[in-house]
Amino acid sequence: MGKGAGRDKYEPTATSEHGTKKKKAKERDMDELKKEISMDDHKLSLDELHRKYGTDLSRGLTTARAAEILARDGPNTLTPPPTTPEWVKFCRQLFGGFSLLLWIGSLLCFLAYGITSVMEGEPNSDNLYLGVVLAAVVIITGCFSYYQEAKSSKIMESFKNMVPQQALVVRNGEKMSINAEGVVVGDLVEVKGGDRIPADLRIISAHGCKVDNSSLTGESEPQTRSPDFSNENPLETRNIAFFSTNCVEGTAVGIVISTGDRTVMGRIASLASGLEGGKTPIAMEIEHFIHLITGVAVFLGVSFFILSLILEYTWLEAVIFLIGIIVANVPEGLLATVTVCLTLTAKRMARKNCLVKNLEAVGTLGSTSTICSDKTGTLTQNRMTVAHMWFDNQIHEADTTENQSGASFDKSSATWLALSRIAGLCNRAVFQANQENVPILKRAVAGDASESALLKCIELCCGSVKEMRERYPKVVEIPFNSTNKYQLSIHKNANAGESRHLLVMKGAPERILDRCDSILIHGKVQPLDEEIKDAFQNAYLELGGLGERVLGFCHLALPDDQFPEGFQFDTDEVNFPVEKLCFVGLMSMIDPPRAAVPDAVGKCRSAGIKVIMVTGDHPITAKAIAKGVGIISDGNETVEDIAARLNIPVSQVNPRDAKACVVHGSDLKDMTSEQLDDILLHHTEIVFARTSPQQKLIIVEGCQRQGAIVAVTGDGVNDSPALKKADIGVAMGIAGSDVSKQAADMILLDDNFASIVTGVEEGRLIFDNLKKSIAYTLTSNIPEITPFLIFIIANIPLPLGTCTILCIDLGTDMVPAISLAYEQAESDIMKRQPRNPKTDKLVNERLISMAYGQIGMIQALGGFFTYFVIMAENGFLPSGLVGIRLQWDDRWINDVEDSYGQQWTFEQRKIVEFTCHTAFFVSIVVVQWADLIICKTRRNSVFQQGMKNKILIFGLFEETALAAFLSYCPGMDVALRMYPLKPTWWFCAFPYSLLIFLYDEIRKLIIRRNPGGWVERETYY
């Protein structure tokens, strides 16, 4: 419904050959897009770049040359995808699936009305009413569904918002600001902190430039950009900046190497908009159900058509019967019931932070068997936090919990005081203004992720960092850069008995240690010997192995005789020591798991759902988080773990021995789909790290090849192709990019993985409850059809009219059917294996046999019993009714005799007949009471389940009140031909109602006592 309706569906295939060619071409294009990005611009020297693009590296392109290229390549914009026109979407709601069945019913009614009006001149207008009502039902529910989904699917508009509006280019040696659309390949472009990158650039010079690539690669840390070629992979090299990512700080100059759809982001956009999502599982279920119902209807219709010809009815009468039976088989109220049930669940999920954009997704989520989850922000808190420190030669654990309820460490050590001072001073991050009342962890910080983690940690442990910085004013600093890999600052020190200047430094641990010759232990300076270096190395490896980002810290008190007050420090010609410093300690940071995630992953496991982590982050970090949240459970080893334990090379380990598996994106690149299938099949716990957007898509397709129903979570633009392809895409509401929200079917308003599990639970519950609603609704079909069949076979007066059937289907049955959507789960639905879409259908043969063959038959008996009682009370005994139909329905015969010889006029006979219709209708309501109560459960006893569902109790009262109103309201005899009943006639169907209840309770008892037995196999739906 809401998913990727591409252009191909609606274009008439002019010639099948032409159509096939187009399809092949489209498939070729999609395969091309799925391939990894290949380019060599990052490997070229500046001279080669100049030759390739003809750009003067100082003067840029000439205006004339830029105009030529613009004419050749077109503007630097993204092509919007072929969108489905709104009227097509609306028509799909009106004529798709179940609606089609009702339309056919409606047309058949008009046809029957037309035939009778030609034959009789003064036709019965029942068929006309029925046709109009059926059409109205379809139109109303169609509008309702369309309105629900009109809020979705505007993918490219959000891509448009990402296009930078202005770009600063150098042309003819002059800087000029132009519209980003006018940027061409070969242009020389300047960017500064705060700008969006206007196209894919090869950087030729940069000063402290960092870009935020998170929307593209999923890396949360800002990435340094410089002219150096640092990696074969263009996505990871330092000298390429990508279209629509943000420059966070610094400046850079680059040559444009691709524009518009040819950029990396453009390729992802084309990939996302070109993908077609398949049919949702619930749409397939409803299709299966329609086939079943239509099969039953046509079978009955044709059988009785032939039978009526054998019974010597005319051709036309037989056709009218055929139409009547097919229409009577259509459950008019069911379309509305299903739509309302799904909407109610969607509303309930919205209260639990799951916003469903596409109603059918509610059902899909329940049948999910694999969840491919992004790591950053979904499984983790999306904020770097200090996790461990190493000082005084031991590792201390910091508190990473969201509410600061975790571990604490000894803060009295003199070394910790020195370490916290360095972390606070050698740090450019600051809290934004006016946040005194906000909890420290929730405060907004200006600065990069690692520095803000240190800032919050020191603020929590040691009080105000702002005051600390005021006590030690900064004199000079050297910011972090990629060549020396450290950051250094010198501060005034007013503490008595200490030197006047304090030098503090932090950076990559091995680089910091190389600059030190002593170490601070328990506040005492000691020489740095081999033993301490080994201890440092072990701590560094241990913290790095936990997937944490480790920084080293050192300081030096500058001697007053060399550096008196007012000394002019020079950072260009460094005139102060940067060697022989005193090492203080390490601090390591990680983006920690969310508190609710391990529990949610555990729930998924017990529900038989496989959780796979797919992330752009490092394998070590990914594996650490996977272990932390339980995606890799305790005791399960990867191939590398087994190799390390047995001390053998990885190549000698049999991959089948390892339950868990961490796959690197570069390995995935060279895998065939068979190898990927092998991994997905034989490993229960899988982590994919360093993956590209195209690979996410390939992983989703791999899972779907195994027959899994896949849910994918993601927040970046890089996730949108996978979100679109998945059976259900789940985007993040807070951190998610607009694009990912458009591609998804569901949005998590709190970005929390645990909300997906709630969604799965709701989805499973609504699937169970829809079964119950459908079973309840279908049962009354039999007491509605059998009167018509007996009317044909036994030639008796019609026991139940068309108007009364409509009053049941669209009146009394609606609220009770919807109330079953509020029913609680019978058992722990999260302890079940996921539903197998091939075998466990929404409506299966067993449900049909229960509703039609068993409960429905008892209901029909109740109705006929009431009919015969009323006829007998009026003088027509059952034996006298058989074969009376032709006389009874002839308006010119006014002397039909009953069993006692009394004569009845046409008018009097019809009043008795319509009273019977009303009584039959009331009997169906009475037996539907019992049906509603037994449909509450499929296995448990009603006494176990209880009557806690208030809506259902209201439904019982509502249908009874409506039946009484229709029977006793003055004027109903004219409007709907319904007549008042004697109170005793209400009780005729009571025994049958009780029989239904007892029959079903005994059936369920046998199922519970004898699981897997014959009764369960034949009757458990």
UniProtKB/Swiss-Prot annotation:
Positions annotated as active site in the UniProt record: 374 (4-aspartylphosphate intermediate)
Annotated residues that bind ATP are located at 485
Q: What GO annotations for molecular function exist for this entry? A: ATP binding; ATP hydrolysis activity; metal ion binding; P-type sodium:potassium-exchanging transporter activity
* Residues engaged in binding Mg(2+): 715, 719
Gene Ontology annotations for the cellular component aspect, listed alphabetically: basolateral part of cell; membrane; plasma membrane; sarcolemma; sodium:potassium-exchanging ATPase complex
Q: Which residues lie on this side of the membrane: Cytoplasmic?
A: 6-85, 151-286, 337-770, 822-841, 937-949, 1005-1021
Query: So what does this thing catalyse?
Result: K(+)(out) + Na(+)(in) + ATP + H2O = K(+)(in) + Na(+)(out) + ADP + phosphate + H(+)
Q: Which stretches are tagged as propeptide in the UniProt entry?
A: 1-5
Topological domain ranges for the Extracellular compartment: 107-129, 307-318, 791-800, 865-916, 969-983
Listed transmembrane segments: 86-106, 130-150, 287-306, 319-336, 771-790, 801-821, 842-864, 917-936, 950-968, 984-1004
The protein here is known as Sodium/potassium-transporting ATPase subunit alpha-1
Question: What is the organism field in this record?
Answer: Gallus gallus
